[in-house]
Amino acid sequence: MIEISNLTKIYGSGPQEVMALKEVSLSIRKGEIFGIIGLSGAGKSTLIRCINMLERPTQGTIMVDGQDVGSLNSLELRRLRQKIGMIFQHFNLLSSRTVFENVMFPLEIAAVPKNEAAQKVNALLELVGLTDKAQVYPEQLSGGQKQRVGIARALANDPKVLLSDEATSALDPQTTRSILGLLKDINRKLGLTIVLITHDMNVIKDACDRVAVIDDSTIVEVGDVLNTFSNPGTPTSRSFINSIINREIPAEILHRQVIDHGSNSSRLIRVSFIGPSAGEPIISSMVQKYAIAANILYGNIDQVKDIPFGNLTLELIGPVNTINEALDFLRKCGLEIEVLNHAGN
Protein backbone atom coordinates (compact mmCIF):
# COMPACT_ATOMS: atom_id res chain seq x y z
CA MET A 1 0.00 0.00 0.00
CA ILE A 2 2.79 2.43 0.97
CA GLU A 3 6.38 1.90 -0.15
CA ILE A 4 9.04 4.30 1.09
CA SER A 5 12.53 3.93 -0.39
CA ASN A 6 15.74 5.69 0.68
CA LEU A 7 13.87 8.74 1.92
CA THR A 8 16.00 11.66 3.10
CA LYS A 9 14.78 15.06 4.28
CA ILE A 10 17.21 17.92 4.92
CA TYR A 11 16.25 21.33 6.25
CA GLY A 12 18.48 24.34 5.63
CA SER A 13 21.97 24.25 4.15
CA GLY A 14 25.59 24.70 5.11
CA PRO A 15 26.19 25.17 8.86
CA GLN A 16 22.42 25.37 9.43
CA GLU A 17 21.72 22.03 7.74
CA VAL A 18 19.57 19.60 9.72
CA MET A 19 18.95 16.05 8.53
CA ALA A 20 15.44 15.17 9.70
CA LEU A 21 15.33 11.81 7.88
CA LYS A 22 18.20 9.68 6.62
CA GLU A 23 17.70 6.95 4.01
CA VAL A 24 14.42 5.70 5.45
CA SER A 25 12.85 2.65 3.79
CA LEU A 26 9.52 1.14 4.88
CA SER A 27 6.83 -1.11 3.46
CA ILE A 28 3.34 -0.63 4.91
CA ARG A 29 0.77 -3.27 4.00
CA LYS A 30 -2.79 -2.65 2.91
CA GLY A 31 -5.28 -2.86 5.76
CA GLU A 32 -2.82 -2.89 8.65
CA ILE A 33 -2.35 -0.50 11.54
CA PHE A 34 1.31 0.44 11.32
CA GLY A 35 2.94 2.31 14.19
CA ILE A 36 5.99 4.56 14.03
CA ILE A 37 7.49 5.39 17.42
CA GLY A 38 10.35 7.67 18.35
CA LEU A 39 11.43 10.36 20.77
CA SER A 40 10.73 14.03 20.11
CA GLY A 41 12.91 15.21 17.24
CA ALA A 42 13.60 11.70 15.94
CA GLY A 43 11.89 12.46 12.60
CA LYS A 44 8.60 10.58 12.91
CA SER A 45 6.29 13.54 12.21
CA THR A 46 8.44 14.61 9.27
CA LEU A 47 8.15 11.08 7.90
CA ILE A 48 4.36 10.95 8.07
CA ARG A 49 4.07 14.43 6.51
CA CYS A 50 6.22 13.28 3.59
CA ILE A 51 3.70 10.55 2.78
CA ASN A 52 1.11 13.09 1.60
CA MET A 53 3.72 15.64 0.53
CA LEU A 54 3.00 18.18 3.25
CA GLU A 55 6.79 17.97 3.40
CA ARG A 56 8.74 17.42 0.19
CA PRO A 57 11.59 14.93 0.69
CA THR A 58 15.08 15.91 -0.37
CA GLN A 59 15.55 12.54 -2.03
CA GLY A 60 13.94 9.12 -2.20
CA THR A 61 10.57 7.86 -3.41
CA ILE A 62 7.15 7.33 -1.83
CA MET A 63 4.61 5.08 -3.52
CA VAL A 64 1.01 5.22 -2.29
CA ASP A 65 -1.42 2.74 -3.83
CA GLY A 66 0.88 2.37 -6.83
CA GLN A 67 1.41 6.10 -7.42
CA ASP A 68 4.76 7.86 -7.11
CA VAL A 69 3.67 10.73 -4.89
CA GLY A 70 6.69 12.89 -5.65
CA SER A 71 6.04 12.86 -9.41
CA LEU A 72 2.43 14.08 -9.24
CA ASN A 73 1.42 17.52 -10.48
CA SER A 74 -0.70 19.83 -8.31
CA LEU A 75 -4.05 18.51 -9.53
CA GLU A 76 -3.00 14.86 -9.23
CA LEU A 77 -1.60 15.47 -5.75
CA ARG A 78 -4.83 17.16 -4.66
CA ARG A 79 -6.79 14.13 -5.83
CA LEU A 80 -4.44 11.75 -4.04
CA ARG A 81 -4.70 13.74 -0.81
CA GLN A 82 -8.45 13.24 -0.88
CA LYS A 83 -7.69 9.54 -0.45
CA ILE A 84 -5.30 10.15 2.45
CA GLY A 85 -7.06 11.30 5.61
CA MET A 86 -5.09 12.85 8.47
CA ILE A 87 -5.72 13.53 12.15
CA PHE A 88 -3.53 15.54 14.48
CA GLN A 89 -2.73 16.12 18.14
CA HIS A 90 -4.59 19.45 17.91
CA PHE A 91 -8.06 18.92 16.55
CA ASN A 92 -8.16 21.93 14.18
CA LEU A 93 -11.95 22.15 14.22
CA LEU A 94 -13.74 25.25 12.96
CA SER A 95 -15.17 26.89 16.08
CA SER A 96 -17.94 28.69 14.18
CA ARG A 97 -19.28 25.45 12.69
CA THR A 98 -21.27 22.70 14.35
CA VAL A 99 -20.02 19.13 14.52
CA PHE A 100 -22.16 18.30 11.47
CA GLU A 101 -20.78 21.27 9.54
CA ASN A 102 -17.18 20.45 10.46
CA VAL A 103 -17.54 16.94 9.04
CA MET A 104 -19.37 18.36 6.02
CA PHE A 105 -16.53 20.80 5.22
CA PRO A 106 -14.29 18.51 3.08
CA LEU A 107 -17.35 17.33 1.17
CA GLU A 108 -18.22 20.93 0.36
CA ILE A 109 -14.70 21.47 -0.96
CA ALA A 110 -15.07 18.33 -3.09
CA ALA A 111 -18.39 19.69 -4.45
CA VAL A 112 -20.38 16.65 -3.31
CA PRO A 113 -24.16 17.24 -3.74
CA LYS A 114 -25.77 18.42 -0.48
CA ASN A 115 -28.17 15.51 -0.02
CA GLU A 116 -25.45 12.95 -0.66
CA ALA A 117 -23.05 14.82 1.63
CA ALA A 118 -25.61 15.02 4.44
CA GLN A 119 -26.20 11.27 4.28
CA LYS A 120 -22.46 10.72 4.38
CA VAL A 121 -22.01 12.98 7.41
CA ASN A 122 -24.81 11.26 9.33
CA ALA A 123 -23.25 7.86 8.62
CA LEU A 124 -19.84 9.07 9.79
CA LEU A 125 -21.23 10.58 12.99
CA GLU A 126 -22.90 7.26 13.72
CA LEU A 127 -19.60 5.47 13.05
CA VAL A 128 -17.71 7.62 15.57
CA GLY A 129 -20.52 7.64 18.13
CA LEU A 130 -21.49 11.31 17.89
CA THR A 131 -24.98 11.21 16.37
CA ASP A 132 -26.37 13.13 19.36
CA LYS A 133 -23.71 15.86 19.01
CA ALA A 134 -24.43 16.82 15.38
CA GLN A 135 -25.65 20.35 16.16
CA VAL A 136 -23.20 21.03 18.99
CA TYR A 137 -20.26 23.41 18.61
CA PRO A 138 -16.65 22.31 19.30
CA GLU A 139 -16.33 24.36 22.51
CA GLN A 140 -19.05 22.18 24.04
CA LEU A 141 -17.14 18.94 23.40
CA SER A 142 -14.56 17.05 25.44
CA GLY A 143 -11.11 16.36 24.02
CA GLY A 144 -12.05 12.83 23.06
CA GLN A 145 -15.22 13.99 21.33
CA LYS A 146 -13.27 16.62 19.40
CA GLN A 147 -10.87 13.95 18.18
CA ARG A 148 -13.82 11.81 17.10
CA VAL A 149 -15.04 14.74 15.01
CA GLY A 150 -11.54 15.00 13.52
CA ILE A 151 -11.61 11.31 12.65
CA ALA A 152 -15.06 11.59 11.03
CA ARG A 153 -13.89 14.59 9.01
CA ALA A 154 -10.76 12.71 7.90
CA LEU A 155 -12.96 9.85 6.64
CA ALA A 156 -15.35 12.08 4.70
CA ASN A 157 -13.78 11.46 1.28
CA ASP A 158 -13.53 7.67 1.76
CA PRO A 159 -9.73 7.62 2.10
CA LYS A 160 -7.69 4.48 1.60
CA VAL A 161 -5.11 5.62 4.16
CA LEU A 162 -5.48 7.41 7.49
CA LEU A 163 -2.43 9.18 8.93
CA SER A 164 -2.48 9.82 12.67
CA ASP A 165 0.15 12.28 13.94
CA GLU A 166 0.23 12.01 17.76
CA ALA A 167 -3.58 12.04 17.72
CA THR A 168 -3.89 10.76 21.30
CA SER A 169 -0.97 12.54 22.97
CA ALA A 170 -3.16 15.36 24.36
CA LEU A 171 -5.75 12.94 25.77
CA ASP A 172 -6.00 11.23 29.15
CA PRO A 173 -5.34 7.45 29.29
CA GLN A 174 -9.01 6.43 29.36
CA THR A 175 -9.89 8.66 26.40
CA THR A 176 -6.78 7.45 24.57
CA ARG A 177 -7.97 3.84 24.91
CA SER A 178 -11.39 4.89 23.62
CA ILE A 179 -9.93 6.61 20.54
CA LEU A 180 -7.61 3.67 19.83
CA GLY A 181 -10.60 1.35 20.11
CA LEU A 182 -12.42 3.50 17.56
CA LEU A 183 -9.46 3.41 15.17
CA LYS A 184 -9.26 -0.38 15.45
CA ASP A 185 -12.99 -0.62 14.81
CA ILE A 186 -12.68 1.61 11.72
CA ASN A 187 -9.72 -0.42 10.50
CA ARG A 188 -11.74 -3.62 10.84
CA LYS A 189 -14.99 -2.29 9.32
CA LEU A 190 -13.52 -0.27 6.46
CA GLY A 191 -10.28 -2.16 5.77
CA LEU A 192 -8.50 1.17 6.17
CA THR A 193 -4.70 1.33 6.26
CA ILE A 194 -3.69 3.39 9.31
CA VAL A 195 -0.24 4.87 9.92
CA LEU A 196 0.04 5.91 13.53
CA ILE A 197 2.79 8.20 14.87
CA THR A 198 3.40 8.19 18.63
CA HIS A 199 5.98 8.46 21.39
CA ASP A 200 3.93 6.18 23.68
CA MET A 201 4.63 2.45 23.55
CA ASN A 202 1.22 1.76 25.12
CA VAL A 203 -0.37 3.09 21.93
CA ILE A 204 1.73 0.68 19.87
CA LYS A 205 0.87 -2.23 22.16
CA ASP A 206 -2.86 -1.53 22.20
CA ALA A 207 -3.49 -0.70 18.55
CA CYS A 208 -0.80 -1.69 16.06
CA ASP A 209 -0.05 -4.78 13.98
CA ARG A 210 3.53 -3.81 13.17
CA VAL A 211 5.90 -1.10 14.34
CA ALA A 212 8.92 0.83 13.12
CA VAL A 213 11.27 2.40 15.66
CA ILE A 214 12.92 5.63 14.54
CA ASP A 215 15.97 7.05 16.28
CA ASP A 216 18.06 10.03 15.23
CA SER A 217 16.38 10.28 11.80
CA THR A 218 16.90 6.59 10.97
CA ILE A 219 14.71 3.50 11.19
CA VAL A 220 16.50 1.16 13.59
CA GLU A 221 13.94 -1.66 13.85
CA VAL A 222 10.81 -2.87 12.06
CA GLY A 223 8.73 -5.84 13.06
CA ASP A 224 5.57 -7.45 14.33
CA VAL A 225 4.49 -5.76 17.56
CA LEU A 226 4.42 -8.98 19.57
CA ASN A 227 7.91 -9.98 18.43
CA THR A 228 9.24 -6.49 19.12
CA PHE A 229 7.85 -6.56 22.66
CA SER A 230 9.02 -10.07 23.44
CA ASN A 231 12.43 -9.74 21.80
CA PRO A 232 13.44 -6.11 21.13
CA GLY A 233 16.45 -5.90 18.85
CA THR A 234 17.88 -2.47 19.66
CA PRO A 235 18.61 -0.37 22.77
CA THR A 236 16.04 2.18 21.58
CA SER A 237 13.32 -0.47 21.36
CA ARG A 238 14.25 -1.85 24.78
CA SER A 239 14.09 1.63 26.28
CA PHE A 240 10.57 2.21 24.93
CA ILE A 241 9.37 -1.19 26.10
CA ASN A 242 10.92 -0.75 29.55
CA SER A 243 8.92 2.46 29.90
CA ILE A 244 5.76 0.36 30.21
CA ILE A 245 7.02 -3.17 30.90
CA ASN A 246 10.18 -3.53 32.93
CA ARG A 247 12.15 -6.27 31.18
CA GLU A 248 15.38 -5.37 32.92
CA ILE A 249 16.34 -7.57 35.84
CA PRO A 250 17.06 -5.57 39.01
CA ALA A 251 20.79 -5.24 39.67
CA GLU A 252 20.55 -6.83 43.11
CA ILE A 253 19.17 -9.98 41.47
CA LEU A 254 21.43 -9.98 38.43
CA HIS A 255 24.56 -9.61 40.58
CA ARG A 256 23.27 -11.82 43.33
CA GLN A 257 25.92 -13.91 45.03
CA VAL A 258 25.09 -17.53 44.36
CA ILE A 259 24.59 -19.34 47.65
CA ASP A 260 26.64 -22.41 48.47
CA HIS A 261 24.28 -25.38 48.30
CA GLY A 262 26.79 -28.03 49.26
CA SER A 263 27.17 -30.69 46.58
CA ASN A 264 24.58 -29.00 44.36
CA SER A 265 25.05 -26.36 41.71
CA SER A 266 23.11 -23.10 41.58
CA ARG A 267 22.27 -21.41 38.30
CA LEU A 268 20.51 -18.11 37.70
CA ILE A 269 18.45 -18.09 34.46
CA ARG A 270 15.86 -15.98 32.70
CA VAL A 271 13.03 -17.86 31.00
CA SER A 272 11.10 -16.02 28.28
CA PHE A 273 7.74 -17.32 27.10
CA ILE A 274 5.15 -16.27 24.56
CA GLY A 275 1.71 -17.49 23.50
CA PRO A 276 0.27 -20.82 24.72
CA SER A 277 3.37 -21.71 26.75
CA ALA A 278 2.55 -18.82 29.10
CA GLY A 279 -0.49 -20.72 30.36
CA GLU A 280 1.13 -24.13 30.74
CA PRO A 281 2.73 -25.49 33.96
CA ILE A 282 6.11 -26.03 32.29
CA ILE A 283 8.23 -24.91 35.25
CA SER A 284 6.23 -27.14 37.59
CA SER A 285 6.68 -30.07 35.21
CA MET A 286 10.43 -29.45 35.06
CA VAL A 287 10.73 -29.43 38.86
CA GLN A 288 8.79 -32.69 39.19
CA LYS A 289 10.57 -34.44 36.33
CA TYR A 290 14.13 -33.57 37.32
CA ALA A 291 13.75 -33.22 41.09
CA ILE A 292 15.54 -29.88 41.24
CA ALA A 293 14.58 -26.77 43.19
CA ALA A 294 13.40 -23.64 41.37
CA ASN A 295 13.40 -20.39 43.29
CA ILE A 296 11.38 -17.64 41.52
CA LEU A 297 13.21 -14.34 42.01
CA TYR A 298 11.57 -11.95 39.54
CA GLY A 299 9.05 -11.93 36.71
CA ASN A 300 6.40 -10.11 34.70
CA ILE A 301 3.70 -10.87 32.15
CA ASP A 302 1.68 -8.77 29.71
CA GLN A 303 -0.42 -9.16 26.58
CA VAL A 304 -0.29 -7.90 23.00
CA LYS A 305 -3.42 -8.55 20.94
CA ASP A 306 -4.62 -11.03 23.60
CA ILE A 307 -1.40 -13.05 23.33
CA PRO A 308 0.48 -13.34 26.64
CA PHE A 309 4.23 -12.93 26.89
CA GLY A 310 6.67 -12.43 29.73
CA ASN A 311 9.69 -13.74 31.57
CA LEU A 312 10.75 -15.29 34.86
CA THR A 313 14.09 -15.09 36.60
CA LEU A 314 14.77 -18.37 38.39
CA GLU A 315 17.49 -19.82 40.54
CA LEU A 316 17.82 -23.54 39.78
CA ILE A 317 19.43 -25.71 42.45
CA GLY A 318 20.62 -29.27 41.85
CA PRO A 319 23.38 -31.40 40.31
CA VAL A 320 25.07 -29.79 37.30
CA ASN A 321 24.09 -32.53 34.85
CA THR A 322 20.50 -32.51 36.05
CA ILE A 323 20.24 -28.73 35.66
CA ASN A 324 21.59 -29.00 32.10
CA GLU A 325 18.98 -31.65 31.31
CA ALA A 326 16.27 -29.43 32.80
CA LEU A 327 17.38 -26.50 30.63
CA ASP A 328 17.22 -28.71 27.53
CA PHE A 329 13.69 -29.69 28.57
CA LEU A 330 12.64 -26.03 28.79
CA ARG A 331 14.11 -25.28 25.37
CA LYS A 332 12.26 -28.26 23.84
CA CYS A 333 9.06 -26.82 25.31
CA GLY A 334 9.64 -23.69 23.22
CA LEU A 335 10.97 -21.42 25.94
CA GLU A 336 13.93 -19.10 25.44
CA ILE A 337 16.61 -19.57 28.11
CA GLU A 338 19.32 -17.11 29.12
CA VAL A 339 21.90 -18.16 31.73
CA LEU A 340 22.72 -15.12 33.87
CA ASN A 341 25.30 -16.62 36.24
CA HIS A 342 26.12 -19.94 37.79
CA ALA A 343 28.26 -21.65 40.38
CA GLY A 344 28.72 -25.21 41.40
CA ASN A 345 31.01 -28.03 42.34
Curated annotation (Swiss-Prot):
Keywords: Amino-acid transport, ATP-binding, Cell membrane, Membrane, Nucleotide-binding, Translocase, Transport. ATP binds at residues 38-45. It is found in: Cell membrane. It is a peripheral membrane protein. It comes from the Bacteria. Disulfide bonds: none annotated. InterPro entries: AAA+_ATPase, ABC_transporter-like_ATP-bd, ABC_transporter-like_CS, ACT-like_dom_sf, MetN_ABC, MetN_ABC_transporter-like, NIL_domain, P-loop_NTPase. PROSITE patterns: ABC_TRANSPORTER_1 (PS00211), ABC_TRANSPORTER_2 (PS50893), METN (PS51264). Transmembrane segments: none annotated. One of its GO terms (molecular function) is ATP binding. Part of the ABC transporter complex MetNIQ involved in methionine import. Responsible for energy coupling to the transport system. Belongs to the ABC transporter superfamily. Methionine importer (TC 3.A.1.24) family. The complex is composed of two ATP-binding proteins (MetN), two transmembrane proteins (MetI) and a solute-binding protein (MetQ). This is Methionine import ATP-binding protein MetN. It comes from Syntrophomonas wolfei subsp. wolfei (strain DSM 2245B / Goettingen). The gene is metN.
